[in-house]
Amino acid sequence: MLGYTLISRMPKTALLLLGLVAACSQRTLTLVDLYSDGGLFPPSLDGNPGNSFDGVATTYADSSAFPADTRSNDSSDGATPAGLRRGLVGLWHFDDAVGSKVAIDSSGNGNDATLVGLDPTLAWVAGRQNGALNTNGLGYASVADSDSIDSITTQTTLAAWVYFDGVIPVDYGTAISRQITTTNEQYYHLSLYQDGTPTLFIGFSASIPAARPTAPQTVAQRHWTHLAGTYDGSLATLYVDGVAAGSRPITGVFPLDTRPVILGGNGNAGAVTEWFPGRLDEIALYNRALSPDEIRLLATAVAF
Protein backbone atom coordinates (compact mmCIF):
# COMPACT_ATOMS: atom_id res chain seq x y z
CA MET A 1 0.00 0.00 0.00
CA LEU A 2 1.03 3.58 -0.55
CA GLY A 3 1.16 6.45 1.90
CA TYR A 4 1.89 10.11 1.22
CA THR A 5 4.08 12.62 3.01
CA LEU A 6 3.37 16.27 2.28
CA ILE A 7 5.73 18.95 3.54
CA SER A 8 4.43 22.52 3.55
CA ARG A 9 5.86 25.89 4.59
CA MET A 10 9.23 25.22 2.94
CA PRO A 11 11.91 27.94 2.73
CA LYS A 12 11.73 30.03 -0.41
CA THR A 13 14.61 28.16 -2.01
CA ALA A 14 13.18 24.72 -1.27
CA LEU A 15 10.67 22.70 -3.27
CA LEU A 16 7.42 21.19 -2.05
CA LEU A 17 8.23 17.55 -1.35
CA LEU A 18 5.73 14.80 -2.02
CA GLY A 19 7.19 11.40 -1.22
CA LEU A 20 5.73 7.94 -1.45
CA VAL A 21 6.45 5.81 1.58
CA ALA A 22 5.74 2.17 2.34
CA ALA A 23 2.85 1.48 4.71
CA CYS A 24 0.74 -1.49 5.66
CA SER A 25 -2.84 -2.17 4.53
CA GLN A 26 -4.39 1.31 4.31
CA ARG A 27 -3.45 4.48 2.44
CA THR A 28 -2.26 7.24 4.75
CA LEU A 29 -1.09 10.79 4.26
CA THR A 30 1.41 12.51 6.52
CA LEU A 31 1.22 16.29 6.61
CA VAL A 32 4.39 17.84 7.99
CA ASP A 33 3.98 21.26 9.60
CA LEU A 34 6.97 23.57 9.75
CA TYR A 35 7.92 25.77 12.65
CA SER A 36 9.66 29.12 13.03
CA ASP A 37 10.83 30.42 16.41
CA GLY A 38 9.02 27.51 18.07
CA GLY A 39 5.54 28.49 16.83
CA LEU A 40 3.23 26.24 14.85
CA PHE A 41 2.14 27.40 11.42
CA PRO A 42 -1.02 25.58 10.28
CA PRO A 43 -0.80 23.99 6.81
CA SER A 44 -1.43 26.57 4.12
CA LEU A 45 -1.01 27.15 0.40
CA ASP A 46 0.80 30.47 0.52
CA GLY A 47 4.18 29.44 2.02
CA ASN A 48 6.31 31.62 4.25
CA PRO A 49 10.01 32.19 3.45
CA GLY A 50 12.31 31.65 6.38
CA ASN A 51 10.45 28.82 8.10
CA SER A 52 12.40 25.68 8.91
CA PHE A 53 11.41 22.05 9.41
CA ASP A 54 11.23 20.85 13.00
CA GLY A 55 10.22 17.26 12.28
CA VAL A 56 6.60 17.40 13.40
CA ALA A 57 4.09 15.47 11.31
CA THR A 58 0.35 14.78 11.24
CA THR A 59 -1.04 11.68 9.53
CA TYR A 60 -4.36 11.50 7.68
CA ALA A 61 -6.06 8.42 6.26
CA ASP A 62 -7.16 10.28 3.13
CA SER A 63 -7.50 13.77 1.69
CA SER A 64 -11.00 14.30 3.10
CA ALA A 65 -9.42 14.82 6.50
CA PHE A 66 -7.06 17.60 5.38
CA PRO A 67 -7.47 20.99 7.05
CA ALA A 68 -9.76 23.13 4.89
CA ASP A 69 -7.10 25.52 3.62
CA THR A 70 -4.87 22.60 2.59
CA ARG A 71 -7.73 20.95 0.66
CA SER A 72 -8.59 24.13 -1.24
CA ASN A 73 -6.47 23.03 -4.20
CA ASP A 74 -8.18 19.62 -4.30
CA SER A 75 -9.84 19.29 -7.70
CA SER A 76 -12.68 17.25 -6.16
CA ASP A 77 -14.39 20.45 -4.98
CA GLY A 78 -13.38 22.58 -7.97
CA ALA A 79 -11.13 24.81 -5.86
CA THR A 80 -8.24 24.98 -8.31
CA PRO A 81 -7.03 27.95 -10.35
CA ALA A 82 -8.39 26.26 -13.47
CA GLY A 83 -11.70 25.53 -11.72
CA LEU A 84 -12.08 29.22 -10.86
CA ARG A 85 -12.71 29.91 -14.54
CA ARG A 86 -15.92 27.86 -14.57
CA GLY A 87 -18.93 30.16 -14.81
CA LEU A 88 -16.72 33.24 -15.19
CA VAL A 89 -18.55 36.14 -16.85
CA GLY A 90 -15.95 38.88 -16.44
CA LEU A 91 -12.41 39.13 -15.07
CA TRP A 92 -10.67 42.48 -14.98
CA HIS A 93 -6.99 42.40 -13.96
CA PHE A 94 -6.51 46.14 -14.59
CA ASP A 95 -3.03 45.52 -15.96
CA ASP A 96 -3.76 47.82 -18.89
CA ALA A 97 -1.29 50.32 -20.31
CA VAL A 98 -1.13 53.91 -19.07
CA GLY A 99 -3.25 55.97 -21.42
CA SER A 100 -5.69 53.17 -22.21
CA LYS A 101 -9.37 54.03 -21.94
CA VAL A 102 -10.38 50.37 -21.75
CA ALA A 103 -9.96 47.69 -19.05
CA ILE A 104 -9.64 44.37 -20.86
CA ASP A 105 -11.85 41.47 -19.77
CA SER A 106 -9.69 38.34 -19.35
CA SER A 107 -12.61 35.91 -19.04
CA GLY A 108 -12.75 35.34 -22.79
CA ASN A 109 -16.28 36.79 -23.01
CA GLY A 110 -15.25 40.16 -24.41
CA ASN A 111 -16.79 42.18 -21.56
CA ASP A 112 -14.24 44.99 -21.73
CA ALA A 113 -14.86 48.02 -19.48
CA THR A 114 -14.71 51.62 -20.73
CA LEU A 115 -13.39 54.31 -18.40
CA VAL A 116 -15.88 57.07 -17.59
CA GLY A 117 -14.82 60.30 -15.88
CA LEU A 118 -11.28 59.02 -15.29
CA ASP A 119 -8.04 60.40 -16.73
CA PRO A 120 -6.43 57.41 -18.51
CA THR A 121 -2.98 58.83 -17.80
CA LEU A 122 -3.65 58.69 -14.04
CA ALA A 123 -6.12 55.82 -13.62
CA TRP A 124 -3.60 52.96 -13.92
CA VAL A 125 -1.56 52.45 -10.75
CA ALA A 126 0.21 49.70 -8.80
CA GLY A 127 -2.20 47.05 -7.56
CA ARG A 128 -2.56 43.94 -5.43
CA GLN A 129 -1.32 41.97 -8.43
CA ASN A 130 0.53 44.03 -11.02
CA GLY A 131 -1.71 46.98 -11.97
CA ALA A 132 -4.95 48.38 -10.54
CA LEU A 133 -7.65 50.88 -11.43
CA ASN A 134 -7.55 54.06 -9.35
CA THR A 135 -11.11 55.41 -9.38
CA ASN A 136 -10.36 57.72 -6.43
CA GLY A 137 -14.02 58.68 -6.18
CA LEU A 138 -13.83 60.48 -9.54
CA GLY A 139 -15.33 58.00 -12.00
CA TYR A 140 -15.83 54.36 -12.91
CA ALA A 141 -15.60 51.78 -15.69
CA SER A 142 -18.69 50.65 -17.58
CA VAL A 143 -19.27 47.18 -19.07
CA ALA A 144 -21.97 47.00 -21.74
CA ASP A 145 -24.73 44.40 -21.48
CA SER A 146 -24.02 41.07 -23.18
CA ASP A 147 -25.36 37.53 -23.40
CA SER A 148 -22.81 36.36 -20.83
CA ILE A 149 -23.85 39.08 -18.38
CA ASP A 150 -27.49 38.16 -18.94
CA SER A 151 -26.62 34.55 -18.01
CA ILE A 152 -26.60 35.75 -14.39
CA THR A 153 -30.12 34.80 -13.33
CA THR A 154 -30.38 32.41 -10.36
CA GLN A 155 -26.82 32.53 -8.97
CA THR A 156 -23.85 34.88 -8.96
CA THR A 157 -20.50 35.69 -7.37
CA LEU A 158 -18.94 39.16 -7.15
CA ALA A 159 -15.33 39.57 -6.03
CA ALA A 160 -12.71 42.32 -5.86
CA TRP A 161 -9.54 43.43 -4.16
CA VAL A 162 -10.16 46.90 -2.70
CA TYR A 163 -7.77 49.55 -1.39
CA PHE A 164 -9.87 52.01 0.61
CA ASP A 165 -8.50 55.56 0.88
CA GLY A 166 -10.76 56.35 3.82
CA VAL A 167 -13.35 58.91 2.67
CA ILE A 168 -16.79 57.86 1.36
CA PRO A 169 -18.89 61.03 0.99
CA VAL A 170 -22.15 59.22 0.16
CA ASP A 171 -23.90 56.02 1.25
CA TYR A 172 -21.55 53.51 -0.38
CA GLY A 173 -18.18 53.15 -2.04
CA THR A 174 -18.99 50.51 -4.64
CA ALA A 175 -16.58 47.98 -6.14
CA ILE A 176 -18.98 46.36 -8.64
CA SER A 177 -22.70 46.68 -9.29
CA ARG A 178 -25.49 46.18 -11.77
CA GLN A 179 -28.85 47.86 -11.50
CA ILE A 180 -31.26 45.73 -13.47
CA THR A 181 -34.25 48.10 -13.58
CA THR A 182 -34.89 51.75 -12.78
CA THR A 183 -35.94 50.88 -9.23
CA ASN A 184 -33.48 50.53 -6.37
CA GLU A 185 -34.70 47.05 -5.42
CA GLN A 186 -33.48 45.06 -8.42
CA TYR A 187 -29.73 44.89 -8.54
CA TYR A 188 -26.59 43.47 -7.02
CA HIS A 189 -23.58 45.29 -5.65
CA LEU A 190 -20.48 44.70 -3.51
CA SER A 191 -19.57 47.80 -1.54
CA LEU A 192 -18.27 49.52 1.56
CA TYR A 193 -20.52 51.64 3.76
CA GLN A 194 -19.36 55.16 4.63
CA ASP A 195 -17.43 53.93 7.66
CA GLY A 196 -15.63 51.23 5.64
CA THR A 197 -17.84 48.27 6.59
CA PRO A 198 -18.18 45.72 3.74
CA THR A 199 -21.65 44.85 2.53
CA LEU A 200 -23.34 42.83 -0.22
CA PHE A 201 -26.69 43.79 -1.74
CA ILE A 202 -28.90 41.25 -3.55
CA GLY A 203 -32.37 42.42 -4.58
CA PHE A 204 -35.06 41.26 -6.99
CA SER A 205 -38.18 43.41 -6.62
CA ALA A 206 -39.98 45.86 -4.37
CA SER A 207 -42.13 42.99 -3.08
CA ILE A 208 -39.12 40.95 -1.89
CA PRO A 209 -36.98 42.60 0.81
CA ALA A 210 -33.37 42.78 -0.35
CA ALA A 211 -30.67 40.73 1.36
CA ARG A 212 -27.87 42.88 2.78
CA PRO A 213 -25.33 40.76 4.64
CA THR A 214 -22.84 43.08 6.33
CA ALA A 215 -19.47 42.38 7.95
CA PRO A 216 -19.14 42.94 11.72
CA GLN A 217 -16.04 45.12 11.27
CA THR A 218 -14.62 47.82 9.01
CA VAL A 219 -11.71 47.26 6.63
CA ALA A 220 -8.33 48.84 7.25
CA GLN A 221 -7.66 52.03 5.35
CA ARG A 222 -4.90 52.07 2.71
CA HIS A 223 -4.62 48.31 2.87
CA TRP A 224 -5.62 45.68 0.30
CA THR A 225 -8.70 43.68 1.37
CA HIS A 226 -10.44 40.94 -0.61
CA LEU A 227 -14.23 41.18 -0.76
CA ALA A 228 -16.58 38.61 -2.28
CA GLY A 229 -20.30 38.00 -2.31
CA THR A 230 -22.25 34.95 -3.46
CA TYR A 231 -25.90 34.22 -4.14
CA ASP A 232 -26.72 30.52 -4.54
CA GLY A 233 -30.46 30.71 -5.14
CA SER A 234 -31.48 30.84 -1.49
CA LEU A 235 -28.70 32.56 0.46
CA ALA A 236 -26.61 35.71 -0.01
CA THR A 237 -23.19 35.44 1.68
CA LEU A 238 -20.50 38.08 2.17
CA TYR A 239 -16.81 37.15 2.49
CA VAL A 240 -13.90 39.27 3.71
CA ASP A 241 -10.38 38.02 2.97
CA GLY A 242 -11.77 34.59 2.13
CA VAL A 243 -13.78 34.17 5.35
CA ALA A 244 -17.59 34.27 5.55
CA ALA A 245 -18.61 37.48 7.34
CA GLY A 246 -22.40 37.35 7.13
CA SER A 247 -25.33 35.86 5.23
CA ARG A 248 -29.03 36.50 4.62
CA PRO A 249 -31.72 34.25 3.10
CA ILE A 250 -33.37 35.38 -0.12
CA THR A 251 -34.86 33.70 -3.18
CA GLY A 252 -35.47 35.20 -6.58
CA VAL A 253 -34.33 35.51 -10.19
CA PHE A 254 -32.50 38.47 -11.70
CA PRO A 255 -34.58 39.72 -14.64
CA LEU A 256 -33.06 40.39 -18.04
CA ASP A 257 -32.12 43.99 -18.77
CA THR A 258 -29.82 46.06 -20.96
CA ARG A 259 -28.11 48.15 -18.29
CA PRO A 260 -24.33 47.91 -17.84
CA VAL A 261 -22.22 46.39 -15.11
CA ILE A 262 -20.38 49.18 -13.29
CA LEU A 263 -16.87 48.75 -11.88
CA GLY A 264 -16.15 51.34 -9.19
CA GLY A 265 -19.65 52.80 -8.97
CA ASN A 266 -23.31 52.08 -8.32
CA GLY A 267 -25.98 52.35 -11.02
CA ASN A 268 -28.46 53.89 -8.62
CA ALA A 269 -31.92 54.80 -10.03
CA GLY A 270 -30.52 55.23 -13.52
CA ALA A 271 -27.48 57.37 -12.60
CA VAL A 272 -24.02 56.09 -11.64
CA THR A 273 -23.07 57.37 -8.19
CA GLU A 274 -21.36 56.06 -5.04
CA TRP A 275 -17.97 55.78 -6.73
CA PHE A 276 -15.26 53.85 -4.97
CA PRO A 277 -12.68 56.05 -3.19
CA GLY A 278 -9.43 54.22 -3.88
CA ARG A 279 -8.03 51.40 -6.00
CA LEU A 280 -9.65 48.26 -7.37
CA ASP A 281 -7.96 45.10 -8.61
CA GLU A 282 -8.83 41.61 -9.85
CA ILE A 283 -12.59 42.14 -10.10
CA ALA A 284 -14.41 38.92 -11.01
CA LEU A 285 -18.05 38.29 -11.90
CA TYR A 286 -19.66 34.83 -12.18
CA ASN A 287 -22.98 33.30 -13.16
CA ARG A 288 -22.67 30.76 -10.35
CA ALA A 289 -22.06 30.81 -6.60
CA LEU A 290 -18.50 29.84 -5.76
CA SER A 291 -17.98 27.43 -2.88
CA PRO A 292 -16.32 28.60 0.37
CA ASP A 293 -13.14 26.75 -0.67
CA GLU A 294 -13.17 28.54 -4.03
CA ILE A 295 -13.65 31.93 -2.35
CA ARG A 296 -10.73 31.15 -0.05
CA LEU A 297 -8.58 30.25 -3.05
CA LEU A 298 -9.69 33.38 -4.89
CA ALA A 299 -8.54 35.45 -1.91
CA THR A 300 -5.03 33.98 -2.02
CA ALA A 301 -4.34 36.07 -5.14
CA VAL A 302 -3.44 33.10 -7.33
CA ALA A 303 -3.45 33.69 -11.07
CA PHE A 304 -6.21 32.04 -13.07
Which residues make up each language-model segment?
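Extracytoplasmic low-complexity segments
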Residues: 31-33, 50, 58, 62-65, ...
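Extracellular glycan-recognition modules
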Residues: 85, 89, 98-103, 138-201, ...
